[in-house]
Amino acid sequence: MATLRVSLSLWNLHAGSRGAGRVYFRARARPRPGDLFQPLPGVCGAGTPCRGLCSEAESGSPKIKKPTFMDEEVQSILIKMTGLDLLKIFKPAVQETKPPTYKLMTQAQLEEATRQAIEAAKVRLKMPPVLEERTPINDVLAEDKILEGTETGKYVFTDISYSIPHRERFIVVREPSGTLRKASWEERDRMIQIYFPKEGRRVLTPVIFREENLQTMYSQDRHVDVLNLCVAQFEPDSADYIKVHHQTYEDIDKYGKYDLLRSTRHFGGMAWYFVNKKKIDGLLIDQIQRDLVDDAASLVQLYHILHPDGQSAQEAKEQAAEGLQLIKVFAKTEAQKGAYIELTLQAYQEAFISSSAAS
């Protein structure tokens, strides 16, 4: 059985330890049956996280299960609101300059090429998952005081068997104090990236995610770039992933830059976040001002799905409200900027009437 031992003086895996210290990595095969190690909590099937943003009610509870991000109805509404702007989805990327390619096509060939482009666009618009933050790992397996002081650095033992899903992979840390514990999520992510490198991900968090650098990116309207880098670097249920996404959404809401995420894979997650926070007023006004009234109605519909006991949902149900009427019900009941929404709706209706009369 091959073993790997590496000394690393600049990387301190344990945030609470004093000094830089040293860390040793050791890779081993699967532990013997009967060992103390147990699979990590919060996984299902082949190790895929199964926690949604809105978790199910506890077993045996009479509470009705709340909708989750991956529910079919929710996904259908979010996909509809996201939009399908092919020019934006396939906008030129920064790369080596090459001469453009021109093709002469028949009408049938053009229609087929357009169909293929739409299918490729739908793949690019597949939304990243939205999960609850993972539970911290604080499991201590043994306290071997006899080993205290024998080493000055930590040992990290990793099961590198290829057949094991990463979520179920055994990774433990031996502290200089003699404590044997399960590795924290951050330690696990780093070790897995060392042994099983993922394209676009670094072992250490890139400096772009520092607060001052994020603010610079936001000021340049590069919110999509931030979110794309975040998806590549972090696990979807990690604290950093959730923090960066929420911070980006809040900046977009603060300055009304919702259109930056429209026709991108991140629009659905943003809409879901605002609906959960009951902060859809800004996005709703933006949709109406851009003549996306159907999307605005879908946003209110999603709001009612997530908050069925609210006054808006109850009145809309009683009135069987749809379309503009659905938006008006929300504006009069639960909207934080109800008067502004009503004025925006009025301006939209007047413009629509004028346009109809002119034609």
Curated annotation (Swiss-Prot):
Keyword NADP: no
Main location: mitochondrion
UniProt entry keywords in alphabetical sequence: Mitochondrion, Ribonucleoprotein, Ribosomal protein
InterPro entries for this protein: Ribosomal_mS22
Pfam hit, one: MRP-S22
Domain of life: Eukaryota
GO BP: any one term: mitochondrial translation
Subcellular location: Mitochondrion
Record GO terms (molecular function): structural constituent of ribosome
Keyword hit for Transport: no
GO cellular component: mitochondrial inner membrane; mitochondrial small ribosomal subunit
Quaternary structure annotation from Swiss-Prot or TrEMBL: Component of the mitochondrial ribosome small subunit (28S) which comprises a 12S rRNA and about 30 distinct proteins.
Family note: Belongs to the mitochondrion-specific ribosomal protein mS22 family.
Entries under PANTHER family matching the protein: MITOCHONDRIAL 28S RIBOSOMAL PROTEIN S22, SMALL RIBOSOMAL SUBUNIT PROTEIN MS22
Protein name per the record: Small ribosomal subunit protein mS22
Source organism (scientific name): Bos taurus
